[in-house]
């Protein structure tokens, strides 16, 4: 499977993030063999994916699973509202509800579509996710997945969501 080169704007954004945020330290529980691997990571809000895609030492050979809805500007507003990016019932919730989803729709898809991602579908297209993942693994690349169970505003359970594909 041939990978498209990362856009200059995505590379510049990654360089900016690396320069302006704390370094990431990778600590291996077991020595890493270099074989194609699936890295199961903590989402930690937006920081887990940003750290793994921008700072992880193996980032150039990694492909992150991303909810397909955030790759499509038309679907982002509904996804953002459902994912609770602001405290429900707060004084600013009405304003956030009419602004943040559309700002996210303008910003997220161009960035994420430029990144080495694999769309994760939650319908019959889930097989597309699996096929793409297997192709990258067979090509010697790695996967990054974030399978925690969302549990409300600024909160995720720390256990793996065993039904994260459906």
Kindly label every feature range from the protein language model.
Residues 1-25:
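N-terminal membrane-anchoring alpha-helices
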Residues 16-166:
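Soluble catalytic domains of membrane acyltransferases
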């Amino acid at each position: 499977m041939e990978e498209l080169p990362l856009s200059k704007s995505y590379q510049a954004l990654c360089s900016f993030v690396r320069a302006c945020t704390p370094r990431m330290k990778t600590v291996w529980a077991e020595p890493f063999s270099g074989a194609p691997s699936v890295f199961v990571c903590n989402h930690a809000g937006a920081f887990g994916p940003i750290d793994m895609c921008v700072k992880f030492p193996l980032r150039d050979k990694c492909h992150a699973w991303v909810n397909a809805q955030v790759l499509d500007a038309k679907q982002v507003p509904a996804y953002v509202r459902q994912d609770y990016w602001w405290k429900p019932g707060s004084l600013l919730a009405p304003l956030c509800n009419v602004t943040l989803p559309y700002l996210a729709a303008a910003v997220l898809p161009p960035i994420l579509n430029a990144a080495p991602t694999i769309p994760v579908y939650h319908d019959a297209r889930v097989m597309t996710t699996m096929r793409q993942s297997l192709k990258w693994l067979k090509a010697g690349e790695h996967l990054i997945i974030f399978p925690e169970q969302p549990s409300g505003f600024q909160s995720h359970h720390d256990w793996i969501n065993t039904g994260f594909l459906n």
